[in-house]
Amino acid sequence: MNTNVAFGKKGEDMASAFLKKCGYQILRRNYRSGNNEIDLITKKDNIVAFVEVKTRHNLNYGHPAEAVTLSKQKELIKAAQNFINDNPSQGVDYRFDVVAIILDESKRNAFNEPCEDIFFIEDAFRTLP
């Protein structure tokens, strides 16, 4: 497996575990719609969240959340619309979240685990009316 792909999967695994601890149910991972993909689709109470996960080793190229550009948002919106059409639900609200992770594997904590920072941005962006 490509090292970037493996690193991204590790970030998605961390985000999934983090969201579960926060009370979210993971409905789908890596939902594909055409060329677009949603990393995680979660649910808590009556909210279904489409979650984009961005993981970086450090801040040399900016904060991971900055990588969720307008064009990426449009791709996520298209995929989410297809998911909603294929999985209609009554009484459910939808939103887009971002989990940004900085995972510095060169630094270790007291348990000899890589140092990590997880940033959870609820309702990170909205669709246009």
From Swiss-Prot:
InterPro entries: Restrct_endonuc-II-like, tRNA_endonuc-like_dom_sf, UPF0102_YraN-like. It comes from the Bacteria. CDD domains: PoNe_Nuclease. SUPFAM superfamilies: Restriction endonuclease-like. It holds the Pfam family UPF0102. One of its GO terms (molecular function) is nucleic acid binding. PANTHER family: UPF0102 PROTEIN YRAN (PTHR34039:SF1). HAMAP family: UPF0102. Belongs to the UPF0102 family. NCBIfam families: PRK12497.1-3, YraN family protein. This is UPF0102 protein Ctha_1382. It comes from Chloroherpeton thalassium (strain ATCC 35110 / GB-78).
